[in-house]
């Protein structure tokens, strides 16, 4: 174990814990012992809010790191929690943090697959380094019926189409790498997980979908039902900018990807964490607009393709509301607006 002067004490939520002095503060970080990413606090805050609302009986934090996620789930959501961590040094960090917080979480120095042989979980949290695809099948096999799986994906180069051959090799799809890429990327990941669940006669239903910084975060409910699996598959298809956005956009097919809702009604009634910060509250307001429209009206991009000056967000939303259109800021772009009308109507009202 490292010397004490190499530790840093951090407080997140209700938990005080230790992490390596050189822990990752921002960005995707590196795969190291005792890995802690401050940039994923929002991810954990939203997860805790969801779990306080859904109240599963037993949760698995499958890639423990410092143990911060599992410790917070146990204390703040009041759920029996198991943490698995294959890295021996990280496992020692988690044990130290359990003692520091006088917690009753269970910790195992085992692989993700091995821990699934010992328990049947109501909630499984998958936050690996990179893609979630190597782990999602095992999770869906070992989750209770109507249980939940939370996934954090950081392979955004593949999901956003910035490396087209990798996107096709990994997901069998084409994604346009432009201002709409993060909604496309989330829809691509949802579609892939829906298809994998359906192959097991299960329905994967997205509950909350988030893009932040270097990662996507999606929480699914998994329901054992071939009928519901078939219904979910009907929401997978291709999307054309020309017919889906406005005639000013060239015809260009993306997909196959998820064309259904990004959230369920649970996202509207989350039991928020105690003392939520401004970032959490602003993000939740944007998440709640996810399903006003499929994609969003990006006012800067529309101005670019029509060679006009960009309108302000405030004046654009005021015009839309004057026409009786419900609207809100999109989480996927700072110049994007989710609307209750067609995107074409929204663009033509604004411009």
Question: What positions do the PLM features span?
Answer:
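SAM-dependent transferase fold signal centered on methyltransferase-like domains
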Residues: 1-351
């Amino acid at each position: 174990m490292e010397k004490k002067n190499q530790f840093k004490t951090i407080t997140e939520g209700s938990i005080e814990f230790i992490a390596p002095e050189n822990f990752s503060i921002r960005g995707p970080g590196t795969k190291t012992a005792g890995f802690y990413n401050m940039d994923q606090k929002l991810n954990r805050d939203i997860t805790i809010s969801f779990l306080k609302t859904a109240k599963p009986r037993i949760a698995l934090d499958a890639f423990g790191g410092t143990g911060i996620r599992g410790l917070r789930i146990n204390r703040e959501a009041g759920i029996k929690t198991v943490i698995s961590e294959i890295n021996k040094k990280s496992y020692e960090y988690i044990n130290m943090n359990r003692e520091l917080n006088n917690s009753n979480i269970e910790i195992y120095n085992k692989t993700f697959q091995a821990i699934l042989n010992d328990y049947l979980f109501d909630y499984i949290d998958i936050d690996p380094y990179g893609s979630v695809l190597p782990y999602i099948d095992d999770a869906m096999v070992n989750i209770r019926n109507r249980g939940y799986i939370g996934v954090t994906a950081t392979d955004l180069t593949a999901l956003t189409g910035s490396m087209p051959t990798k996107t096709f090799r990994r997901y069998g799809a084409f994604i346009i790498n432009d201002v709409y890429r993060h909604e496309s990327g989330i829809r691509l990941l949802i579609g892939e997980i829906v298809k994998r669940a359906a192959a097991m006669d299960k329905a994967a239903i997205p509950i909350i979908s988030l893009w932040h910084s270097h990662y996507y975060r999606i929480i699914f409910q998994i329901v054992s039902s071939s009928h519901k699996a078939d219904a979910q598959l009907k929401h997978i298809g291709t999307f054309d900018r020309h017919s889906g956005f406005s005639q000013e956009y060239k015809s260009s097919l993306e997909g196959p990807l998820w064309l259904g809702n990004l959230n369920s009604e649970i996202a509207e009634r989350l039991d928020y964490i105690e003392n939520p910060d401004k970032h959490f509250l602003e993000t939740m307001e944007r998440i709640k607009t996810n399903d006003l429209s499929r994609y969003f009206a990006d006012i800067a991009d529309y101005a670019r393709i029509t060679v006009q000056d960009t309108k302000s967000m405030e004046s654009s939303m005021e015009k839309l509301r004057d026409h009786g259109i419900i609207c809100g800021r999109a989480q996927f772009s700072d110049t994007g607006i989710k609307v209750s009308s067609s995107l074409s109507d929204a663009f033509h009202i604004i411009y």
